[in-house]
Amino acid sequence: MHIKALLTFLSAANSISALPPLAPRAEDARDVNPFLGKNYFANSYYAGELNQTVNAFLAKNDSLNAARTRTVQNTGTFVWITSVAGLSNIKTTIDAARTEQQRTRKQQIVQLVLYDLPDRDCSGGQSGGEFSSANDGLNLYKKTFVDPYAAALKSAWDLTFAVILEPDSLGNVITNQNIPFCANATSTYEQGIAYAIAKLQAPNIALYIDAAHGGWLGWDGNLAPGILSLLLLLRHRI
């Protein structure tokens, strides 16, 4: 969710809490749709991985699905950055996007996911990350993951970035407080995401907070806690 849109929504919903209203924010270049007039950069690594799929279809004389897969190879997708070791993929992606921008003479928008919170995926453990809040994970997340991530994007001022922050994380802690691991991770999640928002403020970066969806937080028992959690998160960032 775009920060300005989220602030507008939360201001309208503010009557559910005792918090004072959010102050209006001035317009800037990041308040427009960052995708307008730009090419969605096609992740060359992902495109390369699909060559195996193309070849498999061709081996079956299935030219139709081979052609469909080639279309996907040239379609912009998000690059997931999920570990400190994976930070090097940002430079690789930036270099490839600059090459494509020079080749086409068209402005590229690079789509990234930032996903490495301490105690990640607290309700399922399916994507357990490298940081633990019990072992200074929040500080390590800030200094060894978010800081270099932000520095890399800010240095590439000639490109535009759309960054999704920590998918599923807020929805997880809002709706899974009955799970001790999630309850204990709540403060870490909120502080980590707030820090990432603050560090990724730049004219060439558009941020989207994964605030779940209506089928998840839209139920009566989830809506008010969800709005309050987002309000507190953004106030902490502001």
Kindly label every feature range from the protein language model.
Residues H2, A42-N43, G218-W219:
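Alpha-helix initiation/capping motif
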Residues L19-R30, T75-K91, A211, L223-L228:
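Solvent-exposed, charged interface segments at domain starts and junctions
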Residues D31-S155:
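N-terminal carbohydrate-binding/catalytic regions of secreted carbohydrate-active enzymes
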Residues T99-D210, N222-G226:
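Substrate-binding cleft of extracellular glycoside hydrolase catalytic domains
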Residues M1-E27:
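Fungal secretory targeting signals
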Residues A211-H213, L217:
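Secreted/periplasmic proteins that engage bacterial cell-wall peptidoglycan
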Residues N55, A59-A67, K199, P203, ...:
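Surface-exposed substrate-engagement region within the catalytic domains
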